[in-house]
From Swiss-Prot:
One of its GO terms (biological process) is translation. Belongs to the universal ribosomal protein uL24 family. It comes from Leifsonia xyli subsp. xyli (strain CTCB07). The keyword RNA-binding applies. The lineage of its organism: Bacteria, Bacillati, Actinomycetota, Actinomycetes, Micrococcales. SUPFAM superfamilies: Translation proteins SH3-like domain (SSF50104). Keywords: Ribonucleoprotein, Ribosomal protein, RNA-binding, rRNA-binding. This is Large ribosomal subunit protein uL24.
């Protein structure tokens, strides 16, 4: 089970400060998790400009130009935001026994280490 999943609210904890044009301290939702590369794409963070070559679509409209979109950021540079305190926290795992239809099942649950609340 991963510490950070798609849809989690995270905060950038390293990098340039916002006063110098960086992203440190910004919060955003995780759009995508790149498991093989240990990277995440966060909404509204780490924008890059990409120059796209002019081409044509099936309808004949021109495409291309300068586009901006979010680039990936390493998972060690972000921290999950605690839903209770709205501050960055570490993620812990605990096993809980759930009984459903008379069958006991062991489930791993993520929780915020600062508040102890389930995620």
């Amino acid at each position: 089970m991963a510490n950070i999943k798609k849809g989690d609210l995270v905060q950038v904890i390293t990098g340039r400060s916002q006063a110098r044009g960086g992203d440190r301290g910004k919060q955003g939702r995780v759009i995508e998790v790149l498991v093989e590369k240990n990277r995440v794409i966060v909404e509204g963070v780490n924008f890059v400009t990409k120059h796209v070559r002019v081409g044509q679509t099936q309808r004949g409209t021109k495409t291309g130009g300068i586009e901006t979109h979010e680039a990936s950021i390493h998972v060690s540079n972000v921290a999950l935001v605690d839903p209770e305190t709205k501050k960055p926290t570490r993620v812990g795992f605990r096993t809980e026994t759930v009984t459903k239809d008379g069958v006991a099942k062991t489930v791993r649950v993520r929780y915020a280490k600062k508040s102890g609340k389930d995620l």
